[in-house]
Structures are given as structure tokens and as C-alpha cells.
């Protein structure tokens, strides 16, 4: 079984129910709806197709809604794209002007107060580089350092500059409410800078009466400075290497990736590595050797999930991309699972952390064939998963949304089961589920972690070694 999960972005190349089912069959664990593009109606149709494909496959495929965030962009050019020549002056203004090769407007009204002479303005993921020479009222004068062709609405970055934009734009608020009402399993917040950015999202969720995990996209230098508190405040992290590689020197990105993965593992929260993982497969049938190594190294770093963006959303063969990534992951895991970085040993912790840590040790000691977490919220499964152990990890939950959310977590395979009322019900469910599908044999030992009494979220306090086929009183050994 593949442990590292695959997040695939939907888009024009995967827009029909048949195409989405192909991605699920190829190994997609979580579908990403990127709200930087497309309408609510289009994304709703994709959402419904994912649910249909998930039900048909018998797997809990998650749906991640990725909010656009307050990305700052250029305005429009009156006569189409323009060519910026190195050495030329170019003005970016908050005024509403028809753009040309001398000047263009911007959506960021705070630009003149954010920048000072000497600051860099990197347009279109750094392909075009401008340097600020002076600020004159609403106009920011720059000199073109690296030129090129620029078109309407291109995003730009201000590396090293604290940007005065809110955590959520008006569009993000509308999109978040829509996603919650639709039934998204989790949402991702773009351009997170501090733990405080989570507060507005949680306030909207409270207002809607719907709460789902919120992932912070780490793509700003301020997020790196505040990484530990961001990990604690959010429910997971996405290492968004696209904007991160523009905002930071490229040589720093791999180390940020490793640090973010380790911080999330210590906290028991999922972490996604994203951007340009198999980008050449947008048009080719095979990845480059460097891309294969990039995927392998993210696996060896201990990531929960790897994300495909344009490779699946607008690529020429999305299912092949997912299959290729799955093959690389499986091979690396089969050869090098023991090379993952170890966790720091905790001196003090919660009962749940103690029980899940002990369960990992007990499973190895007694030769358990599976670790099983009965969970209402998914937390106990996540706490076990952070140890990245060889023993297969199964989660049993009565909550369909928890099943879909755990699709993002390393190594977790989830069974949807009726609510249990007694610990004897647990072992009966384990016997029924695993023996019927041939996942375990009579006499094998499994280690079960649960809360007693059952059905109360956040009460993981018990562990049981169960001999398969002996369900009922006395089933533990």
C-alpha cells in the first residue's frame, strides 16, 4: 500500500465525471479545486463528480478547496501584451489607467506605501524583474532589470517587503462560505503570514456553523519566520514552492520544505509539498530525472502528500501523471521507508499522544499485522501516522467527512463503520471488516487504539491487542 498521498488539481483537462473517475482509479487521494480559476458552477460539478467517483471506488477521496488569497496583480494592457526592455522605466500605479509599455495599474492600493527605492518587484513568478527607483504619490517608478513580455492580470511579488493586504479578500470570504455550504472537506488559505490569519477563517466557519480543517499555504518569508506558531494555529501546511521560490532565494526552498515537514510531523498535522513536481508531464509522457528525484526526496523528507497542479488541471494526460507519481512513491517506500527522519522523543505529552506512541511500539513488539484507530475526529490516526511506522495503519470512523479528511494523512486507510457503543463492538467490527476482505487472517494480532467510553471525541485513552477471529469478551490477548 502506498503511504504518501496524492493531491491532484482539477481543471479543463479533468472536467467530466469519466475523467475524474480515471484520476481516482489512477490513485488520486484528494481532489483540489483551485478557486483562482473557474466559476462556482464549474467547481460544483467537479465536486459532485469526485463524490460520485469516490462512492463508486469504495475509497474516501477528499476535496480540498484552495482559496485564491489576496494575490497582488497588474491591471490590463489596452492593446494586449507589451514587451519590457531592460533599462527602460516602467511605472506601476494605483490609478485606473489603460496599460501600455510605459505604465500599468495594479490591484494593490497599498503599493506606494509598502515599497521604497531599491525594493524589487518580481512579475509573473520572477520572469520579469523591476527595481523601484522612486515613489511619487500613487505612482511607483521602476527600472526594468530583467525584461520580457507581460500581459493582463499577471501577479507580482515584493520579496522581503511586508505587504499590507488582509488575510482574506472579499472574494475569499465569498468563496469560503460557498465551499463550506457545498461540503468541502478542507480549505487552504493562501499567503499566510502569521497564526492570526487563521482567526478570520474560524470566525466565518463559526458563523456558518460548519468547521473543517484549514491548511496554511507557506509561500511568504513572514510565514517562515512564524512557522512554529502557524503549525500550531492551523490544521496542516502546504509548502507552496511556486511563490516561495520567488519570495526567497531558490537555494533556501529545499531546507524550508524539510523544516516544514518536520514541524508538522512533530505536531501530528498533515503537510503537502506542492508545485512543479512533475511539470514536464504537462506535455510529455515521462518526467525528467530531476523531477523523479524531487518526488523521491519529498517522500524521504516524510511528507504526508504531494500535489500536482498544472500537470493534471491542464496537462495532456492527467491519469498518466498520477500513475507515474504513484509508481515513484511506491518504489521509494519499498526501498527506503526506514530512512525517514526520526521524531524527537517527548518528555511530557497528552494521554492521546502517550497511547498512540505506545501502540506503535506494542505493534512492533508483538508483530501486529495492523494498527487500528477508532476515531471520531481523525486525531488519533494522525498521531499514529506521525511516527511513519512500517505497520499498516487503519482508521475506523462513523463520520464520512473524517474518512475524506484522512485521505490526506500519511499511510492511513479509512473504513466507514457504524457508531460503536462498547469496546466489544470494536473488535467485532475489526474481525468483520478485515477477515471478510482478506486483509488479515484468523490468529493474527492487531493493536487497537480508542477512547473509552466510545463515541466521545478527544478521549483516546485505551489500547488493546486483539487476536483476529476472537471477537467478543476475552478478545484481547
Across the structure, where does each feature detected by a protein language model lie?
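Non-catalytic helical/linker scaffolds that mediate oligomerization, partner binding
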Residues: 1-477
